[in-house]
Amino acid sequence: MHKKQSLFQISKRDTLPLSKALLIRGGILLLALVFCGLITTILTGKNPLSVYATILSGAFGTSRRIGVTFRNVAVLLGISLAVTPAFKMRFWNIGAEGQTMIGCLATTSCMILLGDKVSTPLLIVISLIASLVAGAIWGFLPAFFKAKWNTNETLFTLMMNYIAMQLTSYFIIIWEVPKGAGKIGIINQDTRAGWLPSIGNDFLLPILVVALMTGLMYIYLSYSKHGYEIAVVGESQRTASYAGIKVDRVIIRTMVLSGSLCALMGFLMTSGIDLSLIHISEPT
């Protein structure tokens, strides 16, 4: 009996010239724009070109909009970089939102509780350390359970997002100003205690931090021993064990790093961008 052949088969190309790769991506982008334009016209009756023009104007229409756009891109890129080591290890860390939010919460706690007790430079250092530790703990927990009991990291990290959300909601109610407002407003607005200094403008610091993170992450994954171990574990945990790599240690170490870097972005958001505690899915 002959095995039934599937109608479509997908196989990975060994090599693809850069020019052809760019042509394919450009064609896909063009098709996506055309398709979205058709859907927009059908649903709203508006000219898709005017809709695209409005989108571009909203993102790049003024110098401030350009700065906000690049700042937001930098934050998203930073969070993407944070989960890169885990994904390279094929540990599906879906908890970046919670790890970032717990960094925001740790930073906010330090700014509110220590704002009038220590100097701003010291407060910034304390807030940074607190956020990194909080993110490391948030990354450690699913990694430890995965390493010891082979739990499903996707569900574990996803569920921890909701814990971080509820903790954030709870402390927003505790610290809300004024009572009943459902938000805490700008933290230390009068003293600016714990605020990161502006470099050039309000948008440049996150961009510089993420640019530095990008370079360091490339070096870490491409040229360090840890990066090599992450790659081997990602390809095959059994092969990694045969090679003498302690897989459990690599899993835990990598997720601690991933959680800490997510929390670093939370620190930047709280002490340098929003200057408040919000759910990170809210618009800023």
Identify what each model region corresponds to:
Residues 2-78, 121, 126:
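Membrane-interfacial amphipathic/re-entrant helices at transmembrane-helix boundaries
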Residues 9, 13-21, 60-68, 89-92, ...:
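Membrane-helix interfacial "entry" motifs
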Residues 22-27, 69-73, 98-102, 125-129, ...:
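Hydrophobic alpha-helical transmembrane segments
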Residues 25-40, 79-83, 104, 108, ...:
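Hydrophobic core segments of alpha-helical transmembrane domains in multi-pass membrane transport
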Residues 40-44, 50, 54, 59-114, ...:
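Single transmembrane alpha-helix segments in multi-pass membrane proteins
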Residues 153-223, 250:
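Transmembrane helix-bundle core of multi-pass membrane transporters
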Residues 199-274:
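Helix-loop-helix "hairpin" substructures at the membrane interface of multi-pass membrane proteins
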Residues 276-284:
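Residue-level detector of conserved catalytic or cofactor/ligand-binding positions
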